[in-house]
Amino acid sequence: VRAIASAFALRGLDPLPALQAAQIAPDLLHQPDARITALQMEWLSASAMRELDDEALGWFRRRLPWGSYGMLVRASLTAPTLGVALARWCRHHGLLTDDIRLQVSQSQGVASLQLTEQRELGALQEFAVVSVLRNALGVACWLTDSRIPLLHTTLRFAPPPHADSYRVLFDGPTQFNAPTHSLQFDAGYLNLPVRRDEAALQRMLQRALLLTVRP
C-alpha cells in the first residue's frame, strides 16, 4: 500500500481517492504492521492503475498503459504449450520495458522463471519483483487451467519485516539474499497445453488482478 502511495507521489498526485475506493484508512500508511485484505489490495491496485494509467505502478522508467498485461496474455494465447507461452510472455514483456529481463529455462527436470534487474529499482524493488513474478505465475496457472506448485522461490533482497506473508504469496520455501530472483517448479508443467481461448480471456480480464493478488 505504501509503495502504491509512493507511485502517486512520484506523479505529484494524491492517493486518497484510490485509498477511499479500496476502503483503506490513510493512517494505515503510517502503521508498519498494518494489514489489508486481498480484496482491498485488488481494489486499490485497480484504482491506482487506472488513475495513473500505469499497470506497473511506477516501477519502471516507462509507463505500462492500462491493458499492457492483457496484451501480453493475448499474445501467448495461441501457444501450443505453457513453455512456448511463457517464452513469448517473457520476450514480449521486454518490448514494454528493458528495466527488467525475464527468462524461462529448465535443467534436470526443474523449470526456472528468472527476473533480472537491468537497472536499480530502488524503493520499489520488492513491490515490482514480487508483483511481476506473481503475475507470471498467475498467468501460467490460468493458461493451463492448473495449479502449478512452486518448488522454490529466490529473491535478491533481504527479508522484509513482513517476510511471514511470503508463505501465502509463494508455495514452498523462499530464500532471501539470493543471487537471483526466480520461481522454480517441475519442468513437466511446461509441456501442458494452453487451454484458454479469447472468450475465456475476455472473462478473465474483468478481474485480471486476481492473477496477481492472492487471497
Which positions does each model-derived feature cover?
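N-terminal low-complexity or simple alpha-helical regulatory segments
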Residues: 1-114, 135, 160-162
